């Protein structure tokens, strides 16, 4: 049966019964977002509600973020008791909780904002939150969903129970999380600035339309994986990209969250590969291109704030940390994604593939899937997509990049990480991912 994975209301009834205030973290977001934004201008409200969220993007400090556990050598430890797994889980859900707090604060200060300012502020926060959910879904598979207070009230009638009480949240299937993330990104896209986040100015380093288009392309490229909920059985029976349908908005359309419907001339149904190609083309239309300076090949870069402090454990003195760009989203990745999607959709990805090779000083060659994977492993070595690529290509469990001791310990269950044991102990509604139960 063909599935329409971008239509929010086909998902909401089955999904919302699982939504409750999550147990995933025991820090209150107010600890990170000081004050309530009750005084000052729109600029000051932005500084209180949105600017702090970018501190969580990248996770470059040791033991924080998701970059460390994305490395293949980290697979040597897959125990639910692994401290890094818990730190990454906590990091992601702390950021999600902060986003929800920010949304509540923006709602509280609506009188100080124009309608456009409110829509733009909330869109930026929801885009950051969607990115965090994307990372959590990719790592842990079945995860809980947290919403802001206002969103919870909207969904409460559909769920038949309160989603803002103190009950701890259960998990949702990975396919449901994909529905949610894709819909969120589609809805916020028209309200974000069209400029590149690398351009100097007020949007420098922030989430803009090119960043969201990149994420939508990435979600579509991996839809075969994310739509298959029984990964412990391997991926031979996973759905086919040609059979997964996305309702793609070719213009702004109306927001489904408010009950609107995009008109027929503003949307069309595409399969997963066509959807990936569509959003890659959007990035080209927005002026993205390969540049001589690698820094300009990014849709966005995560920056360590210049005034960030680093604790030296030897002398307990804080030292300034220099700003360091991390190139998470690069246009070379966009071209390789498009080439792969075209090949998987029985098309010809040679033009895009060889643009990347020419930029790297390499001769042209056939754009086979094997060649594309090989070049992704080399050209995107600094990104966190290597593990994801191997899973998508069906090479993860037999990768030559893994040590034999790691290979022998991996099973189909290893495609996602275990739910951290400390999170399971805190929230009795969480269930361990299949294959890891014996390790608890």
Residue spans of the language-model regions?
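Bacterial Sec-dependent N-terminal signal peptides
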Residues: 1-33
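Short, surface-exposed recognition loops and adjoining beta-strand edges that mediate ligand/DNA contacts
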Residues: 36, 60-64, 148-151, 155-156, ...
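Flexible, polar/acidic helix-loop-strand segments at domain edges
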Residues: 286, 294-330, 439
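Extended amphipathic alpha-helical segments enriched in small hydrophobics
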Residues: 130, 217-218, 323-359
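Membrane-proximal, proline-rich intrinsically disordered regions
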Residues: 24-61, 292-296, 420-440
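Short coil/turn linking the two alpha-helices of tandem helical-hairpin repeats
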Residues: 137-139, 144, 196, 219-231, ...
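Conserved, well-structured interaction surfaces
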Residues: 68-140, 164-204, 313-326, 331, ...
């Amino acid at each position: 049966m063909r599935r329409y994975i971008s239509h929010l209301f086909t998902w909401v009834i089955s999904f919302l019964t699982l939504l409750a205030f999550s147990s995933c973290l025991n820090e209150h977001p107010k600890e990170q977002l000081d004050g309530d934004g009750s005084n000052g201008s729109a600029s000051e409200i932005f500084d209180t509600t949105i600017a702090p969220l970018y501190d969580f993007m990248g996770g470059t400090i040791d033991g924080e973020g998701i970059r460390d556990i994305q490395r293949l050598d980290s697979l040597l430890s897959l125990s639910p008791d692994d401290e890094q797994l818990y730190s990454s889980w906590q990091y992601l859900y702390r950021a999600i909780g902060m986003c929800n707090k920010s949304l509540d604060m923006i709602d509280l200060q609506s009188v100080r904002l124009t309608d456009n300012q409110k829509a733009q502020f909330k869109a930026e926060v929801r885009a950051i939150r969607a990115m965090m959910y994307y990372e959590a879904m990719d790592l842990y598979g079945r995860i809980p969903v947290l919403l802001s207070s206002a969103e919870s009230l909207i969904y409460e009638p559909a769920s038949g129970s309160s989603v803002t009480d103190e009950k701890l949240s259960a998990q949702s299937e990975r396919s449901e999380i994909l529905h949610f993330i894709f819909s969120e990104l589609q809805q916020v896209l028209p309200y974000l600035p069209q400029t590149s986040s690398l351009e100097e100015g007020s949007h420098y380093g922030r989430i803009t339309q090119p960043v969201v288009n990149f994420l939508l392309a990435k979600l579509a490229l991996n839809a075969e994986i994310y739509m298959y909920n029984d990964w412990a059985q391997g991926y031979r029976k996973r759905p086919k990209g040609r059979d997964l349908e996305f309702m793609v908005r070719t213009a702004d359309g109306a927001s489904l969250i408010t009950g609107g419907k995009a008109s027929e001339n503003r949307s069309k149904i595409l399969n997963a590969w066509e959807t990936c190609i569509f959003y890659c083309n959007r990035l080209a239309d927005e002026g993205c291109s390969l540049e001589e300076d690698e820094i300009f090949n990014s849709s966005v870069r995560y920056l360590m704030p210049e005034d960030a402090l680093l604790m030296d454990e030897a002398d307990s003195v804080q030292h300034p940390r220099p700003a360091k760009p991390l190139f998470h989203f690069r246009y070379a990745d966009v071209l390789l994604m498009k080439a792969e999607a075209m090949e998987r959709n029985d098309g010809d990805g040679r033009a895009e593939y060889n643009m990347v090779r020419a930029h790297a000083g390499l001769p042209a060659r056939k754009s086979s899937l094997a060649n594309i994977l090989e070049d992704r492993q080399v050209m995107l070595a600094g990104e966190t997509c290597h593990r994801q690529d191997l899973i998508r290509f069906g090479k993860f469990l037999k990768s030559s990049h893994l040590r034999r001791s790691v290979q022998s310990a991996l099973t189909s269950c290893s495609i996602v990480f275990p739910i951290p044991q400390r999170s399971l102990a805190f929230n009795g509604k969480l269930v361990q991912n299949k294959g890891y139960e014996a390790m608890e």
